[in-house]
């Protein structure tokens, strides 16, 4: 296993050079991999495993996702089954349902988790907060995780392009003594690039913090705050949007993703440079207490409980659609529609920052 230096901290990382696909195939040659759920992660992981030569079946209830599985080449009665039959046939049960669905389907899955099988997740939620989810696996099975750092669509797209999406991995329970090898083999099989060592609880807490923080929740809050202040001070919608969202997403993010923030600061105008360096600390000091509060809420299980409770309500979908409609119809994101239609994007920024 490779050890990489991340800013002075050494971490264990598994690469495809150390653990080639041929080795993964050998380890899993006698296994039947049952992918349960064909929604977000299911298609990418199942199709990549199949294309990499593993014995894969899919378990999915009738409906739109079942029809998608058929369209993707899974054959009813041969490689596509109901959830119960797939769990019975599978020696490795990959539970790729949504967190809410895992809770409702768990009583169906559990009876088929007989001694020596492996239960696989791509998110630590159900196990980390199993006092709330009720997902308590039998003691005589392996419980493992490979969590791709991106969507199932990205995993599949990158696989077809000959690239790998990085993933984290963890072993929660090793009943057979072979859980680690199975985990890494599956990580390679689904098309991972690097595999980073973690635990179920670390994956779950960092994932929920990221979603509520800089990946989605905080970024919308920050963008909206700046947009509102610009609008309140007489700037037009297009001007406020361009200086808040458009330059960030279309010009700057690809650059600092590739080169780092220090490169960005070194390669912008002196006015932008001085302002960014001066204001990053006040923003950090204002935001960090909010992130600390968020992390405490995640770690305590409060955020998990909120998710469980909201997803369990009969009118959840109706209320969610109303929230998304309000977001979509807000001035900032309606402005986005017009801006995107009217501007011609080019691959490199025309401004110096």
Predicted regions and their residues:
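NAD(P)+-binding Rossmann beta1-loop-alpha1 motif at the extreme N-terminus of oxidoreductases
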Residues: 2-77
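Rossmann-fold dinucleotide-binding core
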Residues: 120-212
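Interdomain hinge/lid region at the active-site interface
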Residues: 224, 228, 232-233, 258-319
């Amino acid at each position: 296993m490779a050890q990489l230096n991340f800013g002075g901290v050494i971490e264990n990382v598994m690469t495809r050079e150390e653990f080639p696909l041929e080795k993964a195939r050998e380890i899993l040659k006698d296994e039947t991999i049952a992918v349960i759920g064909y929604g977000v992660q299911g298609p990418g992981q199942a199709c990549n495993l199949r294309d990499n030569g593993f014995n894969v079946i899919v378990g999915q209830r009738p409906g739109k996702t079942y029809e998608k599985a058929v369209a993707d080449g899974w054959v009813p009665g041969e490689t596509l089954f109901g959830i119960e039959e797939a769990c019975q046939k599978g020696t490795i049960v990959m539970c790729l349902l949504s967190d809410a669905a895992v809770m409702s389907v768990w009583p169906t899955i559990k009876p088929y988790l007989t001694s020596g099988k492996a239960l696989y997740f791509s998110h630590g939620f159900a196990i980390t907060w199993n006092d709330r989810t009720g997902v308590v696996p039998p003691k005589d099975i392996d419980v493992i995780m490979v969590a791709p750092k991106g969507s199932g669509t990205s995993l599949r797209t990158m696989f077809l392009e000959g690239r790998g999406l990085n993933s984290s991995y963890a072993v929660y329970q090793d009943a057979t003594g072979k859980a680690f090898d199975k985990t890494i083999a599956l990580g390679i099989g689904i098309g991972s690039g690097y595999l980073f060592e973690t635990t179920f609880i670390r994956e779950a807490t960092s994932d929920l913090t990221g979603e509520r923080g800089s990946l989605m929740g905080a970024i919308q809050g920050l963008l909206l705050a700046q947009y509102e202040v610009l609008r309140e001070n007489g700037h037009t919608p297009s001007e406020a949007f361009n200086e808040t969202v458009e330059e960030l997403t279309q010009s700057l993010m690809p650059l600092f993703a590739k080169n780092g923030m220090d490169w960005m600061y070194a390669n912008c105008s002196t006015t932008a440079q001085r302002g960014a360096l001066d204001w990053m600390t006040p923003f950090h000091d204002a935001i960090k207490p909010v992130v600390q509060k968020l992390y405490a809420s995640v770690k305590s299980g409060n955020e998990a409980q909120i998710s469980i409770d909201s997803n369990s309500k009969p009118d959840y979908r109706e209320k969610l659609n109303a929230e998304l409609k309000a977001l979509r119809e807000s001035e900032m994101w309606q402005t986005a529609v017009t801006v995107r239609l009217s501007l011609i994007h080019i691959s490199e920024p025309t401004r110096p920052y």
